[in-house]
Structures are given as C-alpha cells and as structure tokens.
Amino acid sequence: MTTVSQDRLEKEAQTTNRLDVTAHGRIREGKLEGFKRQAAELIRQTKEKDTKTLRYDWFISSDGTEFEVLEAYVNSEGLIEHSMHIGEARNVLFSEFADDHRITVHGDPSPQLVELVNTHAPGGAGGVKWYSFLEGLDS
C-alpha cells in the first residue's frame, strides 16, 4: 500500500466496483497469542505488498474466542492481489490458530474473483456469501 496514496485509492474506488469484505472465524482454544502474532504478520504483508487495499482491520471478541476482519478493496483486482500476497500466511493462520472461516463480500465480483473463490476459498464458494449493492446514501 506504500506505492499508491490513500486519497487516490478512495477516488478510484468511487468510480470502480469497490468490494467490502468481512471475514469471520473462531480462535482455537489456547491459541490466542499465536493468533495475534499471525494476524500481525498478515497485516505487515498487506501493508508492504498490496496496492489496492483500502481497509484491513482486525477485531477480537471480548472473550478472545472469535475474530472479524473488516476489509475494503478498490475492486475485484484488489482482492485478488491481496489473496495472492497473503496466501501462505493465511494458510498458517487457519492450520494452527483459527477455524470456522466464513467470508461475506459486499459488491459485484469479477468473473476472475469468482473463479479464485471457487477454487481456493475455505469451503469453496459455499464459504462465501455475496451481496450486490442495491441502494444507499450516495446512489
């Protein structure tokens, strides 16, 4: 994200098909500290490598058993790029520290993103819920 300004990304997202993503999951018992370290690694890689990521914020439930990640991308290409950059670190997260991974995507994905999800997402397309934009304050 260091090569493109945040203002430029926001403007591009307004004229393209921005995607907002929420990832949900469960932290394995006794694995909270390892989970936090791996989440920090995912954030580090995202900061260093991604060019079309607008948001990538991690949250943990008050009892330390669940997490959510709020994500936003300029477009489908941004989410594809992000997935390629963090693939190995994400695999470590879910093989060692977390499970029950579910994803919600708000926005209209490109065919390339749908193909990627069908082949690589946990549970395939069944682990992802897609919601198309209907109407809002800026529409």
Mark where each language-model region is:
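Short S/T/G/P-rich N-terminal loop/turn motif that feeds into the first structured element of a domain
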Residues: 1-67, 74-85, 96-139
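Amphipathic alpha-helical coiled-coil segments
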Residues: 91-95
